[in-house]
Amino acid sequence: MSAPLSLFVTGTDTEIGKTFVSAALLHGFARAGLRAAAMKPVAAGAYERDGAWRNEDADQLDAAANVALPAAIRTPFLLKAPAAPHIVAAREGVALDIGTIVDAHRRACEMADVIVVEGVGGFRVPLADTRDTADLAVALGLPVVLVVGVRLGCISHALLTAEAIAARGLPLAGWVANRIDPAMPFADDNVDTLRAWLEREHRAPLLGALAHMSPPSPDAASHALDVNLLLNALRAAAPR
């Protein structure tokens, strides 16, 4: 049996569709015959149902995965307030320990063929005084998929994020253009520009361009993603 594959999903900002794209990837992996699981290691914003605290993003990932991870592995750190994780964690008396997440990821890898790890916010969101989500991605040692929210300013945001990923020594396995502003002029031209620059500077392929969907359907969106291209990139980046 081949070793499990895993990837870290980050974005150009918060609220640009990381969970939507992560769920679409899960549908695509499942359609490819893989046991697909998801982690949302740090989630900020919880609601209570049936005596348990839950998170909407984690719920969406659970709905798309065909392997259900225990909540403590899927989301080791569930914070109640929907705000910057390090601020909420300090107020709730929680230490966002990267080692705990790495251990949860190791256990998740024993349960599935591919694990989608969704970050929180953008690529460099503080988790503590001196550590951020980029440090988490490095500790996990995973290839990164960048979700670009296609709106005004996305070109600079995407190129800066790609530079930050490369500076940490992580491979950019690919990127997804997610149309979040349906009224944006020249959206296709922006995507074409990013396709050329990210390919030239980082050899990062466009995995798919997602049209604005209302309501969003990760299953439908999965058909616009080149899952096989991503799987090949993940296999190439896997430790030998």
Curated annotation (Swiss-Prot):
InterPro entries: DTB_synth_BioD, P-loop_NTPase. Gene3D superfamilies: P-loop containing nucleotide triphosphate hydrolases (3.40.50.300). It catalyses: (7R,8S)-7,8-diammoniononanoate + CO2 + ATP = (4R,5S)-dethiobiotin + ADP + phosphate + 3 H(+). GO terms for cellular component: cytosol. Mg(2+) binds at residues 19, 57, 118. Catalyzes a mechanistically unusual reaction, the ATP-dependent insertion of CO2 between the N7 and N8 nitrogen atoms of 7,8-diaminopelargonic acid (DAPA, also called 7,8-diammoniononanoate) to form a ureido ring. This is ATP-dependent dethiobiotin synthetase BioD.
